[in-house]
From Swiss-Prot:
InterPro entries: Bact_Immunity_Domain_sf
Organism from which the protein derives: Pediococcus acidilactici
Source superkingdom: Bacteria
Gene, per the UniProt record: pedB
Name assigned to this protein: Pediocin PA-1 immunity protein
Biological processes per GO annotation: bacteriocin immunity
Described purpose of this protein according to its UniProt entry: Imparts immunity to pediocin PA-1/ACH to naturally sensitive host strains.
Swiss-Prot/TrEMBL keywords: Bacteriocin immunity, Plasmid
Record Gene3D superfamilies: 1.20.1440.140
Amino acid sequence: MNKTKSEHIKQQALDLFTRLQFLLQKHDTIEPYQYVLDILETGISKTKHNQQTPERQARVVYNKIASQALVDKLHFTAEENKVLAAINELAHSQKGWGEFNMLDTTNTWPSQ
């Protein structure tokens, strides 16, 4: 993958994470969404510092948010769901071997 494409994907991930963060902060009460906001903040930091590929980070962020939404019975707006769908799409954007190699991803920052 050339540098321009990888930088574009990185910026796309950062834009999606930031957009969802902004949308969640618009709720009247953000306390139920605080853990999701923390997940997004960690995802932004790790993506900015190249600690994980944007696709893998998108997968981690999406999976953690989906799990938290199930546990806390969170409800997202239509616009938030669109951003979540875009994050999920980015998480699965690698084709063929790239997608296969992501099956063994173990670095999902469990200590967070």
